[in-house]
Amino acid sequence: MRFWTSAAAAEILRRDEHVVRKLLNPRVYSKLVNAFSETETKLRSLCEDSNPQLKNAVSVFQQAVDSGSSLAFAGNNLMAKLVRSRNHELAFSFYRKMLETDTFINFVSLSGLLECYVQMRKTGFAFGVLALMLKRGFAFNVYNHNILLKGLCRNLECGKAVSLLREMRRNSLMPDVFSYNTVIRGFCEGKELEKALELANEMKGSGCSWSLVTWGILIDAFCKAGKMDEAMGFLKEMKFMGLEADLVVYTSLIRGFCDCGELDRGKALFDEVLERGDSPCAITYNTLIRGFCKLGQLKEASEIFEFMIERGVRPNVYTYTGLIDGLCGVGKTKEALQLLNLMIEKDEEPNAVTYNIIINKLCKDGLVADAVEIVELMKKRRTRPDNITYNILLGGLCAKGDLDEASKLLYLMLKDSSYTDPDVISYNALIHGLCKENRLHQALDIYDLLVEKLGAGDRVTTNILLNSTLKAGDVNKAMELWKQISDSKIVRNSDTYTAMIDGFCKTGMLNVAKGLLCKMRVSELQPSVFDYNCLLSSLCKEGSLDQAWRLFEEMQRDNNFPDVVSFNIMIDGSLKAGDIKSAESLLVGMSRAGLSPDLFTYSKLINRFLKLGYLDEAISFFDKMVDSGFEPDAHICDSVLKYCISQGETDKLTELVKKLVDKDIVLDKELTCTVMDYMCNSSANMDLAKRLLRVTDDKEERDK
């Protein structure tokens, strides 16, 4: 009996059935055959391609080996079936059962094991299987290596994949076109186009010709990288070699031109496809429609849509979604809703992306109630709203100031299983809304809830709260949040430092702000001009002009060039300190830096010179301001003209009024009356006074 149930008996029966038949009498032979045939017949039935029941087959196999049967052939066959069905976890588990029962494992099963390890992203173990094959005397083939190459590339280990290719050649196992295409695609997906092209040329040199797939991989990759000249060069080379690019290649090129905004060239390729007699598929049409919509060319997109229907190509969910997105992008929300209804009428079910586009537009338009109706429609049609849906709604409610409803929605997401669980973006939306409305205490409560549920927020969370706590003057809470960032895995970015520097400057804690700026400078993060300007402004306000100058000079040494705001801060600080010489040198430095004074610069200079009694200098800057195209505001005009009146400078007043009238610059009513009254009571030019009045009257007429 032991002989009948041994692994050896099973193998002998398989390989040498005629020998066994001669050695055993008919009764014994019949018993031996029946011992295996019943189980194996059942296994074959369970593994039939038409209706595979592989889990049941594994159970039957396990029961058979538990009862002492050896089913090596059936086991290896089942292993192959499991791998072919892509049920890799079950296949791996089954392989271990085969090992435990001492079942003979053949080459096919080891090949399947190799594929399992690759699918499980364990390429190191897959290499071990190759070694095991070699140890057992099996000659592994190109197919095994191709599986391994695919695994390496999927793990972004393309360098190892190239080494394996070369090792194959050294072992006289020539890589085939699939081998090369796998690694070329890996390099392309990793955006290493030069290496992909280098390997493709090496492929040619090894005597392995490029297939249409090779051309397609390269063209698609160069299109995605926006290198359209190179991609078109490949197409030209294909044509020169007598190869005909397929629709996939043309679609890649059309998409590339659409992504680059070159719709004309994309449309020309589309027309070329039609001229060749090919029928573009929905993907090709969708690519072109999306391209036109992206540039707001809805008329052209609609024409392609109509042409698509005329040609008998059924628009799919992506077609409608692209058009709906385009309509929403140009503010045509009503038309987008009509298209959504048409889509449903045509039995093309919208997906979550389709609904989210419309919900987002409605929320941006402030129509949150309408957006909620779309969410209800979504549920009614059995499309489950996702996190993006609810996050859009949360943002819409917060933007509208309906924070109580936003809070209710967040708690529903937490408690109701029909809703998705909130993510960090959900919490951030509500925290930001509460902070904007100065409800910091509630925002901090939501933050505590976030930490309880998710463990920690992200940089956006901390930046919002740091800004708000410092704005509210709650320095202790801000420092507590800063410490939490330090203790957590959240990486502080420049926005985090900016929030702290700005906040501490506004609360007058300049030493802390300076310390943060220094810390930022020695880290990998480069302080922005805004960071420097915050400190410069605060130092000037507290009268620390010397420190401000040192920081201004350090800023330039660090290649963080001052902007107009930086110069304005320093000019204003210098003028307030009575240092006119420094203010003038700053104006020169501003010009050398290629910057022009703005309205703020001129305002500060004019007002400061007037306070110092330097009317000529003030008028000089007033003239420069007007000549530069800036329209002086009411405050500047009031200051300069009233100063002229107070000093009895009739001629200078007349010159200024003439310049303003010539430029059609209108004074406010009160100042016009003051100037008119002065001009009437002095020897001023009355024609000019009338012109000033006419300009004011004309402005009033235009405003009616």
From Swiss-Prot:
Keywords: Repeat. It comes from Arabidopsis thaliana (Mouse-ear cress). InterPro entries: Pentatricopeptide_rpt, TPR-like_helical_dom_sf. Belongs to the PPR family. P subfamily. This is Pentatricopeptide repeat-containing protein At4g28010. One of its GO terms (cellular component) is mitochondrion. It comes from the Eukaryota. PPR repeats lie at residues 71-105, 106-140, 141-175, 176-210, 211-245, 246-280, 281-315, 316-350, 351-385, 386-416, 423-453, 458-492, 493-527, 528-562, 563-597, 598-632, 633-667. GO terms for biological process: mitochondrial mRNA 5'-end processing. Transmembrane segments: none annotated. It holds the Pfam family PPR.
